[in-house]
Amino acid sequence: MMRRRNKKTKTVISNPETLEERNKFDEIPHDLVIEILGRLPAKSVARFLTVSKLWATSIRSLDFIKSYPLGSSSKPRTLVASKQVVANPSTGRTIPLPRVKTRRTIATSFFGYDSVSDQYKVLCMTVKAYGDLRDESSQHQVFTLGAKKKSFRMIDTSIIPHRPCSNGVCIDSVVYYVAKTGAGMLHLCIMRFDLSSEILDLFTSLPQEIRPPS
């Protein structure tokens, strides 16, 4: 004898207050929502990626990324790593960079966004840790994130001997940094690296009254 089982049905009762709050929230102009998101910390913005496809697309858009403030009023955090990585503070994701092939011992890297090719690039400069600083040569290599070739590639540069002494700043696909140059590396200048053409050159010399850090 076969017994017939009754199928249980599950009834979901929506909370009227929750639906009302969501309807009110949807009435907020999207431009105002983007303005509000731009004032939030990066970690908070990342949480809103799952709200809807529209929000995720807007947050990942180039316009929102460019308009998002670089600075933060909170205390800076330190990332400790045994090798070079590119880190996304909003998601906590890190991408390890390939090893730089060189016999030189000092490496300085700069990171920037190339709006022409829509790619992120890393410029690595390597110099010797010994020798005559007045005649210091350097090598420059570039790594493109997302490229098929997962390695740095050497670029041709014919520039004045210099040694970086500051972090880089990327503005309109150009990375700028302060460097020591001149006799005994006692003068300061601003170097620039065009991420699109991959050309490194001298942007300007700083007044002699400005002394390099010891």
UniProtKB/Swiss-Prot annotation:
SMART domains: FBOX. Residues 22-68 form the F-box domain. Pfam families: F-box, FBA_3. InterPro entries: F-box-assoc_dom_typ3 (IPR013187), F-box-assoc_interact_dom (IPR017451), F-box-like_dom_sf (IPR036047), F-box_dom (IPR001810). NCBIfam families: F_box_assoc_1. PANTHER family: BNAA05G37150D PROTEIN-RELATED (PTHR31111), F-BOX DOMAIN-CONTAINING PROTEIN (PTHR31111:SF67). This is Putative F-box protein At5g15670. It comes from Arabidopsis thaliana.
